Structures are given as C-alpha cells and as structure tokens.
A protein has these predicted regions:
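Single conserved hydrophobic/aromatic residue that forms the stacking wall/gate
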Residues: 1-6, 10
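Acidic/histidine-rich, surface-exposed loop or edge segments in extracytoplasmic proteins
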Residues: 12-34, 98, 236-244
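Soluble metallo-hydrolase cores and metallopeptidase-like ectodomains found primarily
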Residues: 35-89, 93
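Divalent metal-coordination and catalytic microenvironments
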Residues: 68, 101, 137, 203, ...
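Active-site/substrate-binding loop(s) of hydrolase catalytic cores
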Residues: 90-95, 108-111, 115-250
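Conserved beta-strand elements of the Class I
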Residues: 95-98, 330
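C-terminal or late-domain output modules
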Residues: 161, 172-175, 345-394
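Active-site-adjacent mobile loop/cap segments within catalytic or ligand-binding domains
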Residues: 211, 221-243, 273-370
Length: 394
C-alpha cells in the first residue's frame, strides 16, 4: 500500500549519505563582468557559471527559451543556518524583482545587472540587505533575441536592430506572462519568479534608440514608435499604476520613487547634463510641435510617464493585475540601442543609479504587521501578516 511504499522510499533516503556542498569561495571582484562591453548570450552564460561559486547569492535557472537557451535569476540570499522559510521571509520583508534585457537590442541592462550585483556584494551599505529585502535579479530575459543581436552587431555595432527586439519567433512575449502553457517558454521565467517571491516591486530595465532615426518617415511605422524619433533623455521612466481608490497607497509609493530617482540622477553631473541637453532638443523639435505624438511629463529635469489603469486580472503588468501584491511596476528607459564602449557603461551606470536608490528606499521602508493570537473552540490560532503597501519616505 501507500504507507509501505513511502516507508521504502524513506529507508532508501536514510541510507543515502548526505552530499557535502563545496563551500563557495570565488569573489565577484575577480570575475570579468565586461562592464564596458556588449554582453551576448555566450558571455552571459560564462558569467553566470562563475557567479554560482560566489557566496551570498543563489543562482538558479528559471526557464528555457524556445530554442533551448537558459534564463537565470540571482537571489541575494541571507546566510542563515538550518531551514530558510521563504514564506516567513515574505511575511516579514518586501520583495523586489529587477528584470533586464526583455528587449534584446536594449543592451545596457545586462551590464547593469552584473555591475549592481557587484556593488551589493562588496559595499558596506548593503551588508544588511538580505535581512531587509528579498532581491532577485534577472540579468538577461530574452536570451534568444540577445544571441541574434550579438551576431548582427558584429557588422554594424551601433545600429538599433529592432529585428532583434523580440524573441526568436518575433514575439512580444510579455503578453504570455502568467500563462501556464505557452510556446514562448522564456515568458515562464517571470511567471515562476512572481509566484515564488510575490514581489512588492517589479522593475523592468529597458532602452530606446541612442540617436535620431528615420523609420517614422517610411510610411509603415505604427504611431507608438513614431514617438521615438529623437532621444528625449539619457534616462526616463514609466509608472504603471491603478486608479482604484482602495489602492491609493500604491500611487503614493510610486510618487516617492519618482522623487528619489530624480534626486539620485541629479547627483551625477554627466547624467544630469545629458538629460538636460536631450530633453531640451526633444522639447524644441518634437514635444512643442506635436505634444500628443511626442508627450513629455517633466519632473526635476527628468521625464516620466504615468500610465493609469483600473485593476484588471487579465492585464500584463503585475501592478495592474495584482495590485494587492505588487505596489510598483516601473519601466526604465536608457538610450542604448545599440550602445558600445564607454557610452554603454554610462547607460549601465544610469540603470545602476536608479536601481540602487530604489533598493535603498525599500531597505528603509517601514512594514506594517498585522499580528493576531486567538483561541477558538479549544484551538489556538495565530497569524503574522505583512500589510501592503510598505510605507516609504523621501
């Protein structure tokens, strides 16, 4: 019967000697993270394999693409002895997922992921991060597109290559998030991470063309892409938020995030200067003439777009689909199609800057706990619930 079979399995497991895990000893400072070089899929995999030997993090596969390439996530894992209950951690501290390279020709976010990870593992200010935040990095989501893009840029290293924007089937696969069965299997990575970590915040690091382009005059471009004729800023962002009054607290957190990002970027003279220069050009040659086609919402010398929706269980953005779980869904955009060399590094540093200040905001957040202890019909009932959203301050 079942009990006999279970007993046999238990006996075999008891007779199996425990595997001794080799201690991790590699330092991230000794890994070549290619901070000034465009990272293709092969280089990404080499870095991932080395990161598996670095203490303080857990590197694990989250999906396999349509063509068989692997997607990985990096979790900054607390160093506890014994069993680590993720359920209890989620009830105690917030979670953030930082996704990179969803569109493969938007190249700087992969560099930024590895550069950010290095700072988080080596700087004293982040020593307590694993105790205050569940942080997960996905350095390269669109692995098939990245492989295609890397081959194309060998001949034309600064072209935009929108042909490599999507996956190997030419699909915008974010529309397949939260589906249990999809041919666009790379979409399962975000779905699995979301189910496991229930993130309070989703940050998706993207990019836009790094120079003027002519496609909007070709007669076949959709209206949405005409707006990208001219770079508007080194870095700008989108906040996807719900309008429902019961989730007003979510909007408040988004506004604080807008503020701290603007202050952080203003602290870097080179980034601030490019933001000022490009936004002035965009205003003169685009927004001032056709504000509907070329919108721009200015705040502290930054441009941000606020995209409101009613809560919708079928929406692709988690802040709209599950607003009681995800407080913020933020899309960053740097002008990196296709960036190379020192300019690529600058774009990556812009991503790192806004990622860092957001992480610091969450580390300093106040979490409201609902703790209950009751007795009912001779049974003791206890609960320990972290209420969302968290409380953040400027």
């Amino acid at each position: 019967g079942y009990s006999s079979a279970a007993s046999d399995v238990y006996k075999r497991q008891a007779q199996t000697p425990e595997r001794e895990e080799k201690p991790k000893a590699k330092r991230i400072e000794n890994i070549n993270l290619h901070e000034h070089e465009l990272i293709g899929y092969d280089t990404y995999r080499e870095i991932i394999e080395e990161l598996k030997e670095v203490p303080g993090i857990e590197v694990f596969r989250i999906a396999v693409s349509y063509t068989g390439r692997e997607l990985y996530a990096v979790w900054l894992k607390p160093e506890y002895e014994g069993y680590l209950s993720l359920t209890k951690r989620l009830a105690r501290v917030p979670s953030e997922v930082i996704n990179a390279r969803h569109h493969a020709n938007e190249v700087a976010s992969t560099n930024a992921s590895f550069m950010l990870l290095k700072k988080l593992l080596t700087e004293d200010v982040y020593k307590e991060l694993p105790d205050k935040l569940n942080l997960i990095l996905i350095p390269m989501e669109n692995v098939d597109g990245a492989a295609i893009h890397y081959e194309l840029q060998k001949e034309h290293p600064t072209w935009k290559f929108h042909v490599a924007r999507f996956n190997s089937l030419g699909k915008e696969f974010y529309r397949h998030y939260f589906q249990q069965d999809t041919i666009h299997s790379e979409a399962m990575g975000i779905s699995r991470i979301y189910e496991k970590y229930a993130p309070d915040m989703m940050v998706d690091n993207h990019g836009v063309p790094s120079h003027e382009w002519e496609q909007q005059f070709s007669g076949y471009t959709s209206p949405s892409y005409k707006g990208f004729w001219l770079p508007r800023s080194l870095l700008y962002g989108y906040f996807w938020y719900v309008m429902n009054p019961e989730y007003k607290g979510n909007y408040d957190v988004n506004k604080v995030m807008e503020d701290v990002i603007a202050d952080k970027i203003a602290a870097y003279p080179e980034m601030k200067a490019l933001n000022q220069e490009w936004s002035a050009q965009f205003e003169k040659y685009a927004h001032a003439w056709m504000p509907k086609l070329f919108p721009a919402n200015y705040y502290k010398e930054m441009i941000n777009y606020w995209i409101p929706y009613e809560s919708n269980p079928a929406h692709g953005y988690s802040s709209i689909r599950y607003p009681w779980i995800t407080t913020v869904a933020y899309t960053s955009e740097v002008a990196d199609e296709t960036a190379q060399g020192e300019y690529l590094n600058l774009c990556a540093r812009a991503h790192v800057a806004h990622d860092e200040v957001t992480i610091q905001m969450l580390m300093e957040a106040r979490n409201v706990m609902d703790c209950r202890f009751t007795e009912q019909d001779g049974t003791i009932l206890t609960s320990y619930i972290r209420k969302r959203p968290m409380i953040v301050s400027r």
